[in-house]
Amino acid sequence: MSTRTRLVAALAGAGLMASALAGCGGGPSGGGGEGGTLNVLFAANAQFPTEQQEWFKTTSATFKAQTGSDVTFETFATANDELTKIQTSVVSGQGPDVYGLGTTFTPTAYSTGAFVKLDDAAWSTIGGKEKFVPSSLGISGPDAGNQIGIPFVSRPFVMVYNKDLLKKAGIDKPATSWDELEDQAKKLTTGDQHGIATAYKDNFDPWKLIWGMATQAGNPLIDGKTVKIDDPAVKKAYETYFGWLTKDKVVDPAAVGWSNTQALASFAEGKTGYFLFTSTLASITLDKSPVAGRYAYALMPTIPPGATSRPAGGLDAASILSGDNLVVADYSKKQDLAFQFVKMITDKDAQLEYYKIFGNLPVNAEAASSLTSDPNLKVAAEALDKSVATPFSGGWGDVQLALTNVVVQSIPGLAQGSVSDADLAARLADAQKAGQSAVDRAK
């Protein structure tokens, strides 16, 4: 199949039919001497927007000093924006030279055939695969010989809890199952104090919770070429997630409108037992809040709702294999310059500086090993060890969005206090149809 045909097919799988122009894959090629401007796309950091802009500025200055070339950054705000940018760029054959993509979107990028496949020469240009923490390479491509994603940062997810509130409620250790978490949250909820802080309106958090519960129950959501959204394990996951608000009343009703940043801010006030699906970067906020010195991290529950142990086929998934990968556009005429940029921001000192500012764990092996004295990293490292990659399918981006859309469509019902079985069933059926269609078309 030609690159042009592969692109059209892949983009159809992502929901966009159009003619596409792109070159062939391989190692670094194309212009890349001094001068000119490199274009880089990153996710907008809603939690630390000012710090991100300052990082853009200092990184650009460093790159200018090293190469004589400028860097311009643009950002995307949502998963849908991320997908749209990939689509429009590969169709037109122009756009960013370097993309910073969430790990779960790497399969979608790979399926287009529009990003440089990393041969030995390409890896050597940036310091070799041995430069990176081995587990961070787990979603760089479908296999070790077909990779496009260069690890940038790792973000294994954990939960954070208020030590004082748990002790006061007679809870001696954090929950390890979702049912136990529900029981503890009920004990923690009293007056204006709530058991759980979560973000129903966040663009990323909801689907991760659903994926985690389903994966622990033995449903990977994509099994080969079969999507399994309209499934009892997935339905149970949504019922549990929605039930914290509608049935158990352990979540602040305002959470229907919260982003992850707002949920973190609520936990930081000191009136919530648990904050779910965060990372150690939360410490930057928490250490300046009323809960400073009163919180600790723990693994997310790994036993699915309604169970006391994982069933056959269930995975010990404490987190998605989460973080950001860097990919270089095949259409870029500045690939040599792009790989110089990638090398610069994945070197040890740059990685440690990024960790200091944002709290994201380094994927540079030398940088990561230098942080072992940080007590927060013990839990994060365990979460990384128990991280499971989302399915490497070109249709995953749409499956992820379909899972999110079930929550988006349920927000009005959540705000009113209930989501009916009929409404949930209909939304799961629609999500199943959309996801299966995307996977069927993906290459």
Identify what each model region corresponds to:
Residues 103-156, 208-209, 214-216, 296, ...:
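Hinge/lid segment of periplasmic solute-binding proteins
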Residues 167, 383-443:
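Conserved C-terminal helix/tail region of periplasmic/extracytoplasmic solute-binding proteins
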Residues 2-107, 307, 434-443:
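Conserved N-terminal structural module of periplasmic/extracytoplasmic solute-binding proteins
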Residues 302, 310-311, 355-402:
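Long, aromatic- and glycine/proline-rich binding clefts that accommodate carbohydrate-like moieties
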Residues 243, 247-248, 288-357:
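Extracytoplasmic/periplasmic substrate-recognition and gating elements
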Residues 185, 226-255:
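Glycine-centered hinge/linker elements that transmit conformational signals in sensory
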Residues 144-152, 157, 179-230, 239, ...:
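Extracytoplasmic/periplasmic solute-binding protein
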Residues 62-132, 167-169, 173-176, 274, ...:
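Extracytoplasmic "Venus flytrap"/periplasmic binding protein-like
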